[in-house]
Amino acid sequence: GLNPRTGDRILEIGGVELNNRMLTGNNFHRYINPERDSEEGALAVHGLTTEFLSDKPKFAEIAEEFRAFIAGAELIIHNAPFDIGFLNAEFKRLNLPPVHEQVHGVIDTLVQAKEMHPGKRNSLDALCDRYGVSNAHRKLHGALLDSELLADVYLAMTRGQNSLSMEEEVEVAADGAALEIVP
């Protein structure tokens, strides 16, 4: 789906943890039963069918585990308003606080990329190409794979001439998690 305000739901959440600019191996990945049928347009993007998701946990069943994963973290998200909108809609259904009250902050790599590369394509695939991050194995949009790709892109983006100071870089990465949510 494309819009949580029209009832679209999260189908998959994936996140990887970075600590001192290194992947820790502490990943979060869950498929989620959206309690509704997959839409044709969304199905073409992620390939997750209604049948596949039917026996997966509902968001309410994984919410506390996910909240523990992101608690106090600096989230690194590509096109953050899109993903945060879906997360906040799910949290609101459960009477839980919005994302910004649960995390240290959010870095939007799309905003960063547009500042660093104005007028250029700045999709995750375009950034993978620009920074030499291999995404050849990516056929469909998948939350965990996209999180891993985004972590590599973020590290490449922030080590160049336009990077933050080293102190800021380490502070951001020390408790940061790159997240991608597939609505």
Q: Can you describe what each PLM-predicted range is?
A:
Residues 85, 122, 148:
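Active-site phosphate/pyrophosphate-handling residues
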Residues 1-103, 114-117, 126-140:
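Conserved non-catalytic scaffold segment of RNase H-like nuclease domains
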Residues 111-114, 129, 152-155:
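Generic alpha-helical structural context detector
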